[in-house]
């Protein structure tokens, strides 16, 4: 009987250790950034999903076709043109307005330093009302590999996504990060 209990306990401990290792690995394969924005959910949704909204705080130029398979094309340079080699193209995978949308990089800019890692990641952006007139925005990027290039890109977006949220918070004059990304 003791031997049976000992084997059962050992199996349970191994299962818990395996689950914890998987959870730690999964965390290393994603980026999560969030901020509380001093604006209502519908307004923040519009700031992310309309050309005028995105151009008011994030990029110099944009075109957004918010539908399944539609493109979000953005350009950070005023002198650039949508469609040139500096354009970033993302394809919408899903959306539930005004709560969330997901997208995948379909064409990075020509100077993007990560030749292959972008091909496996996708982004989910959540918009949660937290109190009257305020919205929690969470950006999660998933699908990173454990290879060097993918982890370098993960660090790039850990900084970049939080910077993006900080810019949005500044637009609404409430620089209140809910949490910073984990140390890289």
Role assignments for model-derived ranges:
Residues 111-159:
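Beta-strand/loop substructures that line and gate deep hydrophobic ligand-binding cavities in soluble
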Residues 38-57:
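Amphipathic alpha-helical segments
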Residues 15-22:
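C-terminal segment of classical bacterial N-terminal signal peptides
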Residues 33-35, 61, 87-94, 120-129:
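Hydrophobic/aromatic beta-strand elements that line small-molecule binding cavities or substrate pockets
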Residues 170-184:
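Short, highly charged C-terminal tails/helix-capping segments
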Residues 1-10:
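Bacterial N-terminal signal peptides that target proteins for export
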Residues 38-42, 66, 93-101, 126-136, ...:
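A short, structured loop/turn motif at beta-sheet edges
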Residues 52-87:
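Short beta-edge strand/loop motif at the mouth of beta-sheet-based domains
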């Amino acid at each position: 009987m003791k031997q049976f209990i000992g084997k059962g306990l050992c199996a349970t401990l191994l299962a818990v250790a395996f689950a914890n290792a998987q959870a730690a690995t999964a965390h290393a394969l994603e980026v999560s950034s969030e901020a509380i924005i001093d604006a209502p959910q519908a307004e923040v949704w519009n700031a992310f999903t309309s050309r005028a909204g995105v151009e008011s705080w994030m990029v110099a130029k944009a075109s957004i076709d918010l539908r399944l398979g539609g493109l979000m094309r953005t350009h950070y340079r005023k002198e650039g043109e949508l469609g040139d080699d500096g354009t970033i193209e993302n394809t919408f995978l899903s959306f539930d307005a005004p709560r969330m949308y997901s997208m995948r990089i379909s064409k990075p800019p020509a100077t993007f330093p990560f030749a292959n890692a972008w091909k496996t990641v996708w982004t989910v952006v959540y918009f949660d009302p937290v109190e009257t007139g305020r919205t929690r925005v969470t950006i999660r990027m998933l699908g990173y590999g454990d290879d060097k290039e993918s982890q370098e890109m993960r660090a790039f977006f850990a900084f970049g996504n939080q910077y993006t949220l900080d810019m949005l918070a500044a637009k609404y004059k409430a620089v209140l990060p809910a949490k910073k990304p984990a140390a890289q």
